[in-house]
Amino acid sequence: MLTGQGTPTYQDTEITNDGFWPNLNAGDFERRRSTPMAQDAENIQYAIVAAIDSCNIELELLKADYLENGINSAADVTTGATIAGKNALCIQYERAVFARAKADLLPDFATVHQRDAGKDLAERSQETKNELLAESNRIIRNMYGKTRSTVTMI
């Protein structure tokens, strides 16, 4: 939403997670992923919840490994870089979730920004969606300690 001076304002809705992975703020998503100001706040919240659930399923084995080793929260992991007290694992988690949420919201973004969309809008939107989902998958692979690609001998 825009204020009278054209300054964007972001919602301050905290989305509660499962206790291991960090809670996320919908306003952080709006700011970091440059969502259109006309986008419905509740729709953004729902997309983030869906992305959280999707990432949590993919990260279940990693979470179980941490719990088995006495680490009860992603915030308690002490390896890796930190920014303002937030560790690399939590930052990666947030980035993976936000990439998936934005991929989910892309069709809505297109209708907010381009009412008379060109004929290639659907293709660009699908390409961007694929890039965002690939970004999320790369981050999750990194969280598991894997590189961008893996070769396995059959």
Model-flagged regions — what are they?
Residues 85-154:
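Short loop/turn elements at secondary-structure junctions
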